[in-house]
Amino acid sequence: VHTVMSLAAIFGDNIGIEQSSIITALIVVQFVGFPATLFWSYIGNKFSDKFVIYSTIFIYFCGVIFSMFLSTSTEFFNLAALIGSVQGGIQAASRSLFSKLIPPHQSGEFFGLYNTFGRAGAVMGPALVGLFIGIFESIRIAVLPVIILFFLGAAILYFVKVNPSNFQNT
């Protein structure tokens, strides 16, 4: 998620999207994001945080695939709206799920660790994309590591067992 957020403008610029359109797209993400986060919150309460995370990972996955083929500002805006529709939901559901997995009396320490891993991901993801750009000389192919990272995240999440007795943490 951090990789997508940090590379969106660079990606748009590299495929020929005008700066004004990139800025507009980033604003679209914010306007779509607020109501979408409320929607995902409802879905999380109705089903589960894991369901929201899996669903939003799938949508991110589709967005990354779509990004490999887009070429116009309109397509870039559509991608921005798609990403905006899941960005807040995946972040909120991830934090909610994490809070259900940690000891309540150590939440500060664990959320500090959570943020550290998030920041590490914001460095490692773009580094992988940069490596792929260096190897394949194409930013479109360079988004492949993002797909791999989403797949790995979903695979790891599969093994996470949520203990219902921890639900009082939220």
Predicted regions and their residues:
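Short amphipathic helix-loop junctions that connect adjacent transmembrane helices
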Residues: S6-I22
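Loop-to-transmembrane helix entry/capping segments in MFS-fold secondary transporters
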Residues: Q19-S20, P104-Y114
